Amino acid sequence: IPILLDFYNDDNQISTVMHPILRDVAAAVGDKGKVIKINVDKNNELAEALRIKMLPTLMIYKSGEMVWRQSGEQDADTLINLIKEFI
């Protein structure tokens, strides 16, 4: 199952804009994928380990391997299609 990780914080305007987009993505992929939001302020060590420099940063993991990574705003259709590639 592909997992989309969204690294964000509440002070970042683009991160806030992404919240409803990620809800749409989660609804579209259903049980064939997962969307997990990670607040970098509460998970600082993880953010540092993954070298999160820009918010939001989105990653897709499949079978424990990172298969895609992008920083900045993405639209729902792009994210849905990316996740479907890894189903």
Task: List where the protein language model places each region.
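Conserved phosphotransfer microenvironments
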Residues: 15-16
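Non-catalytic, surface beta->alpha helical segment in thiol-disulfide oxidoreductase systems
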Residues: 54, 60-87
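Structural micro-motif
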Residues: 3, 50-59
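Short pre-active-site segment immediately N-terminal to redox-active cysteine/selenocysteine motifs
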Residues: 1, 8-11, 54
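Thiol-based oxidoreductase modules, predominantly thioredoxin-like and allied folds used
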Residues: 7-9, 19, 23-26, 30-45
